[in-house]
């Protein structure tokens, strides 16, 4: 291992070979770091974090953050989570936070300033763009693209090959923060394989975007979107089929 001292590595940490750590890195108890990893300046690997081989992490990033529950939080638990699992060749940018209890599969890319909350699973080769926020208890499939400042609400499911454009917004609370009844009805969104969400569109709680469906830029989806159908407007309405050449089955 080579480093720019000072760094702090707990005696219980397990380190592979050919690891490079920047200035001020902190490695807590129970951390495992695979071979060939590169860790940027002032990054913190909290208790139980597990890195595969050839993982790259930028500066001032935190892995293994435990959730903090506000006194009136609706969807965050006080339970402690095991450290995150980071697959081989994952790349994580600077000033990002990867919470405990999440899994990033191999070859995932996480850009700067992104947040991935607890109990989240991200499939292989998915891209999480700059400033993206994925809330707790979400499943993100493989080969997805979540672009700058997209927001994935808690309890959501995103399939494989899903495209989420910049500034997409999702919600899980139809009661908009009022009444005790809302606690029984929290429900995230579902985007099936090949769904595409245009720039700045909004998907309301519990709505399902069918396979290969398209939600146009700026639209507000208030009901389920049928597969292979284009939706436009506020509220979004079906305007026709997705062109055959754009369907997932016809891509290389």
Regions found by a protein language model. Give the residues of each.
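Structural signal for interior beta-strand "rungs" in well-ordered beta-sheet cores
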Residues: 2-70, 74-232, 237-238
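C-terminal end-helix/capping segment
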Residues: 235-247
């Amino acid at each position: 291992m080579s480093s720019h001292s000072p760094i702090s590595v707990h005696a219980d940490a397990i380190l592979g070979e050919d690891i490079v750590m920047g200035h001020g890195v902190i490695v807590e108890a129970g951390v495992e770091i695979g071979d060939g990893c590169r860790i940027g300046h002032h990054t913190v690997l909290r208790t139980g974090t597990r890195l595969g081989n050839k993982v790259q992490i930028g500066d001032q990033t935190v892995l293994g953050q435990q959730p903090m529950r506000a006194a009136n939080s609706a969807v965050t638990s006080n339970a402690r989570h095991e450290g995150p699992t980071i697959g081989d060749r994952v790349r994580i940018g600077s000033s990002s936070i990867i919470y405990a209890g999440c899994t990033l599969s191999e070859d995932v890319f996480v850009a700067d300033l992104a947040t991935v909350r607890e109990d989240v699973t991200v499939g292989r080769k998915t891209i999480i763009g700059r400033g993206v926020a994925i809330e707790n208890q979400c499943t993100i499939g493989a080969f997805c693209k979540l672009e700058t400042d997209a927001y994935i609400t808690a309890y959501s499911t995103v399939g494989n090959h899903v495209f989420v454009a910049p500034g997409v917004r999702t919600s899980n609370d139809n009661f908009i923060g009022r009444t005790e009844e809302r606690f029984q009805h929290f429900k995230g969104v579902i985007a099936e394989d090949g769904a595409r969400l245009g720039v700045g569109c909004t998907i309301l709680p519990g709505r399902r975007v069918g396979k290969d469906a398209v939600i146009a830029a700026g639209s507000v989806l208030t009901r389920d979107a049928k597969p292979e159908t284009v939706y436009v407007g506020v509220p979004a309405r079906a305007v026709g089929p997705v062109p055959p050449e754009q369907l997932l089955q016809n891509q290389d």
